[in-house]
Amino acid sequence: MTIFAKDKLIAYGQLMRLDKPIGTLLLLWPTLWALYLAEKAMPTLSVLAIFICGVFLMRSAGCVINDYADRHIDGKVKRTSLRPLSTGRATPREAKWLFIVLVFCSFLLVLCLNLYTIGLSVIAVILAFIYPFMKRYTHLPQFFLGAAFGWSIPMAYGATIEALPLECWLLFIANLSWTVAYDTQYAMVDRDDDLRIGVKSTAILFAQYDNKIIALLQIITLIFLFSVGYLSQLNNRYFIVLAIAGLFFVYQCRLTKNRDRASCFNAFLNNNYFGLTVFIAVLFGI
């Protein structure tokens, strides 16, 4: 079977999670927040297109390297047992090359930006590469994911104003807290399997306090987003819509209350609407 056979292309698409766009959206929203907040207006179409394409490529690359890192354990977890590397529909060598191609394409995009952003992109690649391996060594892999998913924020500021002001880092921390919260919800789905095979996560670390800590992280997210709005001198419409966005967190807390797998997964998916609503808040506020 050639690497371009139909079955292989389908497997590569699944490695890149083309059939599951939620991760791309969760990475896209904070990127858009940062681009619009840095400019206090709509960014140029070229910069916007570069970042949207970059989000897609780097999220895809992250999924590929994640499956490569987990290739020996995915088959032992119900949710991931049918992934291409677990079933043999793609090989580890193919996954490595796919990761390299995706990162290379991302780098070509970054070369269209300024040197400031090119330098920041090196950190983005390092974070994307190391995150999948952290679940073997620490119960805090979600924090590494938060850093990886949030690094588009300083890159967005770098690409537009070539500076990283305080509000950039406050937005980064807000996104970090949000990412840890929603990825803990995601990890709660696999907690029983992860305990059995020895994989670490914040869902395991937080144990019976998981819902309380998720709620705390969500409160921190909102506090920092309010702070960003204040420092960026956004108008009152931003704060009103942001308060509405907070209602999604209340709904998620109700979903995860009983720790049912399906409900935890639905809470995770609901974060897309939170990200979208915050973006609307930014649009109304600038």
From Swiss-Prot:
Catalyses which reaction(s): all-trans-octaprenyl diphosphate + 4-hydroxybenzoate = 4-hydroxy-3-(all-trans-octaprenyl)benzoate + diphosphate
Cofactors required: Mg(2+)
Protein name according to UniProt: 4-hydroxybenzoate octaprenyltransferase
GO CC annotations, alphabetized: plasma membrane
GO function terms (MF aspect): 4-hydroxybenzoate polyprenyltransferase activity
Pathway(s): Cofactor biosynthesis; ubiquinone biosynthesis
Keywords assigned by UniProt, alphabetized: Cell inner membrane, Cell membrane, Magnesium, Membrane, Transferase, Transmembrane, Transmembrane helix, Ubiquinone biosynthesis
E.C. designation(s): 2.5.1.39
Membrane-topology annotation of the record: Multi-pass membrane protein
